[in-house]
Amino acid sequence: HAGSLRKARGATAAALDAGLGELMGRYADRSGAVRHPRELAVEVEPVKARFSAWYELFPRSTGEPGTNGTFSDVESLLPEISGMGFDVLYLPPIHPIGRTQRKGANNRKGTPGDPGSPWAIGSEQGGHKSVNQDLGTLDDFRRLVRVAAEHGLDVALDIAFQCSPDHPYTREHPEWFRHRPDGSIQYAENPPKKYEDIFPFNFETEQWRELWAELLSIVVFWIEQGVRVFRVDNPHTKPFAFWEWLIGEVKREHPEVILLAEAFTRPKVMFRLAKLGFSQSYTYFAWRNTAPELYQYFMELAQPPIREFFRPNLWPNTPDILTEYLQTGGRSAFMARLVLAATLGASYGIYGPAFELCESRARDQGSEEYLDSEKYQLRAWDRGHPDNLRELITLVNEIRRENPALQTDRGLRFHPTENDRLLAYTKSTSDHADVLLTVVNVDPHHTQNGMVTLPLGDFGIESGRPYQAHELLSGARYLWNGPRNYVEINPHAMPAQIFRFRRPVRREHDFEYFL
């Protein structure tokens, strides 16, 4: 019997051996495994593809008033931008700008001295692989990328596959463009708008292989200069097959590259681009302003299958988009949209100086174009203005960094408020260790109040015991009890509240000395 006992103990020890358990986990029994009917590709991307904060500026507007800013001027702003909590610095095209049909202030016909639109790429200085000499040299740009990295910032470049009439491609490869009956190259049109300063590529040219290879070489060139993040201009106007091929080629050698699709188009097209490999996508967020609109839109984005392939990047404004809400809502509208973008989405961005300073002047009645837009002229921004939003932006980004719940697009739930001017939602980690409630007054003019109802049990909070709600924007702490609690938000003070819940307040029963 003693021998049998020793043998049994040895078998037990062997069965419980940690090393054996590790081997069994690594090499599981596959005798019952079946093959999926379709072969699926799994793509692994950097964390920044999921969680990022973007800041956009025009380098030429970073100099002294009346002078063209340079990469060196941008470099001097890096501590400030990084200090606000951003980790991506997005620059519009930095290439030479064409002179033919150059645009002037407010999209008028250009005059001598106008800097033109950065999206009219190409001149006698060069094309997509060249740097506008007014900004500096290629070495200056490389230095900017290096110094930005030291501040925790990735420099994102704009990829705009289009040319000015002066681009070297128009002379060297006229076959890459569409032509009019008179033989001239066809400029871009989006009726009733005409863009005489821009020639789009003809992706259906008989020389498409050479064209595609050259466009790929542009992306690779800038990767070689240290760029790992790209914002792609109007990808929905190019063939799907082109993007599937180009992204595949780029990712094969550089899987760390992140591509943001700037495609304001039909949802099916936006979703198709995401499935083809774009890391992030612009959204309709800018035009969803009421609580019901926001609820409906983000319920769509947060549910499978869309959430499995579409990563939203939320922008309350861009150089092209100054919404009516921002035009008429005053400073409180900018604050509300900032909080919404930064807490509804794991990735968001702002067109920086204009947003910080609450720039709300439209070019025309009913237009979303900025008056005196930076797209066509230099702007001198008073970055030190006392009414700027820098302090709030810094605080919101700090809250995002400290709370894992805000670093993913999963875990979003909306909650009733009994007031359709209040939007209430929680973001939580899968284990509910981090739960944040955000309540936003979407009415930028009037104080709103209501009762917010929460499913406390889902968050590990006993409904019969008080718990602490720490409001992170003001620092205030409230003692809440039960699932329904009162909130009141004055938009002129702060149009939003972000609560972090602390576990139930302890009572005498919770201490050892209670007998």
Residue locations for each model-derived region?
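Residues immediately flanking
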Residues: 159, 263, 318, 442, ...
